[in-house]
């Protein structure tokens, strides 16, 4: 979730409101987790066996959604994707997203975003260079907020790509290793997904995951 809003209902599956256009994500094999924190804020459909999902949201979104597909247990393996992502005027991310169980942490590797950079309102940890670009790295502490274990206090880690892109390979290990210098557990992973998140404006995306 964005730094300035609580992330609730991580394990909730909500029916989606109909909308005219999709966000599409696919992976050839291995998908075994659906992230569906939607709350009827957009049109979310998926086919887990095919490794595809769609999401489209219209103006009027005033709360947070995070949807995506991935794996019940995350890893530091690289993820290759390509996307057609449109979030002009929307507070939104296209990111690798997940959780670490202990110490409990929520993380984002933000490849592209709309009109809000999460590192603009968080504590800077510096920068890391990976996959042809510098990433801003920042952290925030969420106190008594909803999490994967209920209400808890946990750390958020963000790497935000300066040269935003919608295709390429994310060398996840580069980010995990950098964050580990600042308290990230880098083990005992919970789920990990390629995700679309938004909490204002309108947008859509089309993504293919190939690793």
Swiss-Prot record:
PROSITE patterns in the cross-refs: GH11_1 (PS00776), GH11_2 (PS00777), GH11_3 (PS51761)
GO cellular component: extracellular region
GO biological process: xylan catabolic process
Highest taxon listed in the record's lineage: Eukaryota
Enzyme class label: hydrolase
Keyword Coiled coil among record annotations: no
Active-site residues annotated for this sequence: 106 (nucleophile), 197 (proton donor)
Record GO terms (molecular function): endo-1,4-beta-xylanase activity
Keyword Coiled coil annotated: no
Location within or outside the cell: Secreted
Keyword tags: Carbohydrate metabolism, Glycosidase, Hydrolase, Polysaccharide degradation, Secreted, Signal, Xylan degradation
Residue span, GH11 domain: 19-210
Annotated EC: 3.2.1.8
Reactions catalysed according to its record: Endohydrolysis of (1->4)-beta-D-xylosidic linkages in xylans
Pfam families found in the cross-reference section: Glyco_hydro_11 (PF00457)
Pathway noted in the entry: Glycan degradation; xylan degradation
Signal peptide: 1-16
Gene3D superfamilies: 2.60.120.180
PANTHER family xrefs: ENDO-1,4-BETA-XYLANASE A-RELATED (PTHR46828:SF2)
Function: Endo-1,4-beta-xylanase involved in the hydrolysis of xylan, a major structural heterogeneous polysaccharide found in plant biomass representing the second most abundant polysaccharide in the biosphere, after cellulose.
UniProt record similarity statement: Belongs to the glycosyl hydrolase 11 (cellulase G) family.
Protein name as annotated: Endo-1,4-beta-xylanase 6
Gene: XYN6
């Amino acid at each position: 979730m964005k730094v300035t809003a609580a992330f609730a209902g991580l394990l909730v599956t909500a029916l989606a409101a109909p909308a005219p256009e999709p966000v599409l994500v696919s992976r050839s094999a291995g998908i075994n987790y659906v992230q569906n924190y939607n709350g009827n804020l957009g049109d979310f459909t998926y086919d887990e066996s095919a490794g595809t999902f769609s999401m489209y949201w219209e103006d009027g979104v005033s709360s947070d959604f995070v949807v995506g597909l991935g794996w019940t247990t995350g890893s530091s393996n690289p993820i290759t994707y390509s996307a057609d992502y449109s979030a002009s005027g929307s507070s939104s991310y296209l990111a690798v997203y997940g959780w670490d169980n202990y110490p409990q942490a929520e993380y984002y590797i933000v490849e592209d975003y709309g009109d809000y950079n999460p590192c603009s309102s968080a504590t800077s940890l510096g920068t890391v260079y990976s996959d042809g670009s510098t990433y801003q790295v920042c952290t925030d502490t969420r106190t008594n907020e909803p999490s994967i274990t209920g209400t808890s206090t946990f750390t958020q880690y963000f790497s935000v790509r300066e040269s935003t892109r919608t295709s390429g390979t994310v060398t996840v290990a580069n980010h995990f290793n950098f964050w580990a210098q600042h308290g990230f557990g880098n083990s005992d992973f919970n789920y990990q997904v390629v995700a679309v998140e938004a909490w204002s404006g309108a947008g859509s995306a089309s993504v293919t995951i190939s690793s």
